[in-house]
Amino acid sequence: MANYYDITLALAGVCQAAKLVQQFAHEGQADQAAFETSLNTLLQIYPEDTLAVFGGKAQNLKLGLETLLEQMHGTGSDLSRYWISLLALESKLNKDPHAKAELARRIQYLPTQLEHYDLLDEQMLSTLASIYVDVISPLGKKIQVTGSTLYLQQLAMHHRIRACLLAGIRSAVLWRQVGGTKWQVLFSRRKIIAMAKQIYSSL
């Protein structure tokens, strides 16, 4: 039987990353706490459980849970495209052993770099963006990010958006690992909504 608690947390992680992409693209800034939570998921290689990936607190997924509930009710076309595309890219990643191995290799190197840089430093964001461009982008159709030209022309914003997309892939991988399937998104929305509301009400 599907564990909708874990599935919902992971899906909220995907939605949180998608929402951050939207915020950066339209506003040039994003929810800083949510951004840090999402980036930190990339460092959780051997988590104790699903919640541990997100810092052990459901509160860290507040933005993601809000976004997930909005999405399950069908609002926000850009957002829908982002998180659905992330799930699709993860599916392609899962079928590509070479890409999976390369992603694991690059991710395992991150703690070494963190000895020299903070996770939110430009150098680290550039590194995360490079992993996305080198490993994830070639797997499928490019995710077209829409927003303000003012922000989308900035290299630093490209780094933030791609770092968020990489974090979205991390949550999508987790979603698959805990039993998430596209059929649940299509046919079990009530269960996902009910669980998201239950988790959100406990924050």
UniProtKB/Swiss-Prot annotation:
One GO CC term, this protein: plasma membrane
Tell me what topology the record assigns in the membrane: Peripheral membrane protein
* Pfam families (alphabetical): DUF489
Q: Is Metal-binding among this UniProt entry's keywords?
A: no
* InterPro entries the record matches: HflD, HflD-like_sf
Location(s), subcellular: Cytoplasm; Cell inner membrane
Keywords tagged on the record: Cell inner membrane, Cell membrane, Cytoplasm, Membrane
Where does this protein chiefly localize?
cytoplasm
Q: Which Gene3D superfamilies match?
A: HflD-like
Q: Which PANTHER family does the UniProt entry name for this protein?
A: HIGH FREQUENCY LYSOGENIZATION PROTEIN HFLD
Q: Which family does it belong to?
A: Belongs to the HflD family.
- This one is known as High frequency lysogenization protein HflD homolog
Q: Which species is the source of this protein?
A: Pasteurella multocida (strain Pm70)
